[in-house]
Design a protein with these regions (language model features):
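Bacterial N-terminal signal peptides
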Residues: 10-18
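Sec-dependent signal peptide cleavage junction
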Residues: 17-41, 51-55, 59
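Non-catalytic, glycine-rich low-complexity segments
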Residues: 72-127, 132-134, 174-181, 563-569
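Aromatic- and carboxylate-lined catalytic core of secreted/periplasmic carbohydrate-active enzymes
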Residues: 84-94, 109-113, 451, 461, ...
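Short strand-edge motifs at loop-to-beta-strand transitions and within beta-strands
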Residues: 100, 142-144, 638-640
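Active-site mouth of glycoside hydrolases
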Residues: 118, 163, 180, 186-413
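Extended acidic/polar, glycine-enriched regions
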Residues: 130-196
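Catalytic-core region of carbohydrate-active enzymes that cleave or remodel glycosidic bonds
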Residues: 375, 408-501
Length: 659
């Protein structure tokens, strides 16, 4: 009873004092539009709720210290101070982190080259040894692709399982490697990694990597010229990642690799090369569309119960090694297969039930990591969060976490050592405030690993430009430091999936005819494909990697009624970014988004320094423009009522403590 009286007294005092401590507003346009009495009422409410939230947080605590440190896997290269080779057979030149290729021709023929012999390149220099798998490339040709991670002299020697074949075994060479001289960050800073132990990706040298992906599930159907055009455009727009699956590829891994696959693999190689030459990281799924894993296993020994037989496992390892050999020298991220976490909707696709224990893609993950000496990030493309989340309801998981999102099952890759980020599939509601369950699951329960919104709704298939940019802002300000944008008709080129239906995200309607008419050239010019680039520019100016999501903690932000927001600030709250929207237009077409009245109101920021001096600017996510910079002084309670947005669209507010 005393406790309740204390709270009531505190709240009454807060309300009374709030009238005498309202801040002096700067004279600027963003304060016009809402009647003064409503602004005053909103501000008093904000102070009231903020103070109450602070009190509750002190009593009950928060989840904000519950994030574990990520487990850092041991690197795959070996410490080695090998001696130089006195008289190498060949000498090559290279630049750091750029892929190189060496071909060896066997003087001996094999009945089944893919199966009969393996070749490996041992590359050493600067105290490191890399054991890099080679691949058979048709006829009597074996190739190896490698990248030198540092300047200096590197040496190599081949090792062949047929040691008597001297045309493949004990071949030697020297590589004179100089520093990369080009313009792309991926080669200036090194391949992307999670080994820094952060909730975001970094380059090899520790520089934060901004993940902004463009989706291409039908890379096999895209032409080489298309890929070249798309890459050049996406780089100019600010994209950093090309997300692909091999749908439509002209090779077949289900029953061995033969001469019949050579031309299809050469075509795919050229696309990998173009993506790399444009400085993009290639987040690629392996081998084929996911349902082909069934015939692959059946053709190579079948199942032992619900698990692949030993011979099927051996074949899975062999094709995994082959994929790594062809593509690991490029800047890549491995994503395994379409929605294979946790089971590719097994009940809907008529394959043996996979679960936490027997998903065959868990084997592929381990095999890829075994042969990938560059330790590229690895994940499994997840089903939508209605089926699988990071921890979800936790049923069957090998660890214990707080359940935030009980509607989904947990990832089946949580206990896989090689799995080091979560490729989440999530399309947040465009018409109501998030309840933050998905976001909290990804932030608190991801074992310290990055969790990104790898797949949302595609522009001009299930959403339009508002929804496509909203998903990116929501992801980054919710601690999901990566976003996979996608547009129709590039998300899956020539795919007619769902074109026969009209769709609506609650904001915009996409008609069947709009879907049918969409071309891949159109997708290059969708407004949101530029707008996510503006988002990247803005967030990089704020050191996004220091921003911590505060979710629904009202001690940081109290939204006005029917205002959508995503809020993040740095550790001491001296840098704050808030994405906000709400509209009065009930037609919800193009420039409107919600069926609820929200006006152009915003809310109250909290956890500021009492009577502290701050500046703020509005950022327009539609055109990338900034407002003037304004000043304000926080109340003695450490709050500030923002007032109206400058315009009735989604906007971004950046608040900084004054120097």
């Amino acid at each position: 009873m005393k406790f309740k009286k204390y709270i009531s007294l505190l709240l009454c005092i807060s309300v009374i004092l709030s009238f005498s401590v309202l801040p002096s507003y700067a004279s600027n346009s963003n304060q016009a539009g809402t009647p003064a009495i409503i602004n005053t009422a909103e501000e008093i409410t904000g102070i009231f709720v903020n103070c109450f939230a602070k009190l509750i947080n002190r009593i009950k605590g928060t989840d904000e210290t519950a994030i574990p440190s990520a487990t850092i896997n041991p690197h795959s290269w070996i410490e080695y101070k090998g001696e130089p080779i006195e008289n190498p057979e060949q000498t090559l030149t290279a630049e750091t982190w750029v892929a190189n290729e060496i071909a060896f021709e066997s003087e001996k023929s094999y009945a089944s080259p893919f199966n009969d012999v393996d070749v490996e390149l041992h590359l050493w220099g600067n105290g490191r040894l890399y054991k890099i798998p080679a691949f058979w490339d048709g006829g009597n040709i074996w190739k190896v692709r490698f990248a030198c991670p540092s300047e200096g002299d590197w040496y190599f020697r081949t090792v062949c399982t047929d040691a008597e074949n001297t045309s493949l075994d004990s071949r030697t060479g020297k590589v004179i490697c100089s520093e990369y001289s080009g313009e792309y960050d991926i080669y200036k800073h090194g391949f992307v990694t999670t080994n820094a132990g952060n909730k975001y990706f970094t380059y090899d040298d520790g520089t934060p990597f901004f993940y902004l992906g463009d989706t291409h599930w039908s890379l096999g159907d895209e032409t080489v010229d298309m890929v070249k055009t798309i890459c050049e455009k996406r780089v100019s727009q600010g994209f950093t990642v090309y997300q692909s699956e091999p749908i439509g590829a002209k090779f077949d891994f289900t029953n061995g690799i033969t001469e019949d696959d050579k031309s299809g693999l050469a075509d795919y190689d050229e696309k990998f090369r173009i993506i790399a030459e444009n400085g993009l990281v290639h987040a690629n799924a392996q081998f084929f569309f996911s349902y082909y894993i069934e015939p692959l296993i059946s053709n190579n020994g079948g199942f032992n119960g619900n698990e692949p037989s030993d011979s099927a496992k051996a074949y899975l390892e062999k094709v995994s090694r082959y994929w790594v050999a062809r593509y690991s020298a490029y800047p890549v991220i491995w994503t395994l297969g379409q929605e294979v976490d946790n089971d590719f909707y097994w009940s809907e696709t008529n394959h043996p039930e996979w679960g936490l224990e027997n998903n065959p893609y868990k084997l592929i993950a381990e095999y890829i990591a075994k042969y990938d000496v560059y330790d590229h990030p690895l994940s499994a493309h997840m089903e939508n969060v209605g089926a699988t989340s990071v921890y979800g309801n936790g049923k069957g998981a090998t660890d214990e976490c707080k359940v935030y999102f009980k509607d989904a099952e947990p990832s089946c890759f949580r206990d896989i050592e090689s799995h080091n980020f979560y490729a989440v599939q999530w399309h947040p509601s465009k018409t109501e405030q998030s309840d933050f369950r998905v976001e909290k699951d990804c932030w608190y329960n991801s074992q310290g690993k990055p969790a990104i919104n790898y797949e949302g709704q595609y522009c001009y298939l299930w959403t339009k430009n508002f929804g496509s940019r909203m998903q990116g802002w929501t992801a980054y300000l919710s601690g999901m430091y990566g976003y996979g944008w996608g547009g129709h008709d590039t998300w899956s080129y020539l795919n007619v999936y769902d074109e026969e239906n009209d769709s609506s995200d609650g904001v915009d309607t996409i008609t069947s005819q709009e879907k049918i008419n969409a071309t891949w050239q159109d997708a290059l010019e969708y407004e949101s494909s530029y707008q996510v680039g503006y988002m990247r520019d803005f967030l990089e100016s704020t050191k996004w990697y220091n921003l911590i999501p505060r979710f629904d903690n009202k001690s940081y932000f109290v939204p006005a009624n029917n205002v959508y927001y995503a809020y993040a600030g740095n550790e001491d709250n001296s840098e704050i970014v808030i994405y906000i929207y709400s509209f009065t237009d009930e037609s919800v077409a193009q420039n409107a988004n919600t069926k609820y009245y929200g006006g152009i109101k915003t809310g109250t920021v909290g956890n500021l320094v009492s009577n502290g001096s701050y500046t703020y600017q509005w950022f327009n996510p539609i055109n990338g423009e900034y407002s003037e910079e304004y000043e304000f002084t926080a109340t003695r309670f450490g709050t500030y009522y923002i007032g109206d947005r400058p315009q009735a669209t989604d906007m971004v507010l950046c608040i900084s403590a004054a120097d």
